Amino acid sequence: MSAILFPEYTHRHLLGIEGLVPVEVTALLDRAEIYANRNRSANKVSDEMRGRTVINLFFENSTRTRTSFELAARRLGADVINMQVGSSSVAKGETLIDTAVTLNAMHPDVLVVRHAESGAAALLAQKVNCAVINAGDGAHEHPTQALLDALTIRRRKGRLGGLDVAICGDVLHSRVARSNIHLLTLMGARVRVVGPRPLIPSGIGELGVDIFHDMREGLRGVDIVMMLRIQMERMQGNFIPSVREYFRYFGLDREKLALAKPDALIMHPGPMNRGVEIDSDVADDFERSVIREQVEMGVAVRMAVLEVLSGNLASMETA
């Protein structure tokens, strides 16, 4: 029997952060660290996934995430197929299953899935033989975003444990927030969510976070300020009185940022709504904003995840 290539991470898929243990997260981050350094060198391309096929199956538009996964796979030498599917064409679970069966017949090695419905990636994982990576499912999880955020923080701060992190804004509709809460609390950070009452989900405190409805109090003394995009496309009803009022009370500007630690990092998963959840002055702060670095770390993290899952899949095939 062949040994698992990456024994620190033995899952066939990456469907979420919830359920992982610290050693698994650390293994993925350590592997991503190698690629982060390699990606800054002249020779970025390798052959760890030569002969492997990655299908990007996106039922929601996401140029940034899809491009990041595509670049990651190509830098590992994989063949990449991008399938952009309008969410309206997959209205029933049976149709999604039919899609899975069809793709499975093509024998891909990795399926990267983004879908508007929570649990879609997990459903596909039950129907295919390849590895499945959840690239975002509804408001549920976005595991590679949390991993790239963690890598960005660890590279700047040297650790995750013991840090105070404020996740601010539209937590209700944010899969990024949920995955980050799972990962950061797992790794020993203290997490607080900050936002207006309508945008903070009920029961969020059960995940081990503190809750603040006052932005200034929520930012006081934190090491990391993670802003979230206001997701108007997912809102039905009046969650905020106006964009102008939202920015006044919950938008990140110099005045509010001054309440965080002097060396606090500014983060945002993108795309940003400048003048809504974040002011351009702080978003572009050369010393403290790591928003562009998050994009850079996204490629490294996705290279690590793709390599680990495809490598272990190969080990399972020869077992």
From Swiss-Prot:
| Swiss-Prot/TrEMBL GO biological process terms | 'de novo' pyrimidine nucleobase biosynthetic process; 'de novo' UMP biosynthetic process; amino acid metabolic process
Kindly list the GO CC terms recorded for this protein. cytosol
Query: What is this enzyme's EC?
Result: 2.1.3.2
Q: Which InterPro entries match?
A: Asp/Orn_carbamoyltranf_P-bd, Asp/Orn_carbamoylTrfase, Asp/Orn_carbamoylTrfase_sf, Asp_carbamoyltransf, Asp_carbamoyltransf_Asp/Orn-bd
Chain sites annotated for binding carbamoyl phosphate: R64, T65, R114, H142, Q145, G270, P271
Q: Which UniProt keywords apply?
A: Pyrimidine biosynthesis, Transferase
What's the top EC group for this one? Answer: transferase
Q: Which Gene3D superfamilies match?
A: Aspartate/ornithine carbamoyltransferase
List the catalysed reactions: carbamoyl phosphate + L-aspartate = N-carbamoyl-L-aspartate + phosphate + H(+)
GO MF terms on file?
amino acid binding; aspartate carbamoyltransferase activity
**Binding-site list for L-aspartate:** K92, R175, R229
User: Pfam families this protein is in?
Assistant: OTCace, OTCace_N
Pathway, according to UniProt? Pyrimidine metabolism; UMP biosynthesis via de novo pathway; (S)-dihydroorotate from bicarbonate: step 2/3
- Subunit record text: Heterododecamer (2C3:3R2) of six catalytic PyrB chains organized as two trimers (C3), and six regulatory PyrI chains organized as three dimers (R2).
The text of the family note is: Belongs to the aspartate/ornithine carbamoyltransferase superfamily. ATCase family.
Q: What function does this protein fulfil?
A: Catalyzes the condensation of carbamoyl phosphate and aspartate to form carbamoyl aspartate and inorganic phosphate, the committed step in the de novo pyrimidine nucleotide biosynthesis pathway.
Protein name in the entry? Aspartate carbamoyltransferase catalytic subunit
Q: Which organism does this sequence originate in?
A: Rhodospirillum rubrum (strain ATCC 11170 / ATH 1.1.1 / DSM 467 / LMG 4362 / NCIMB 8255 / S1)
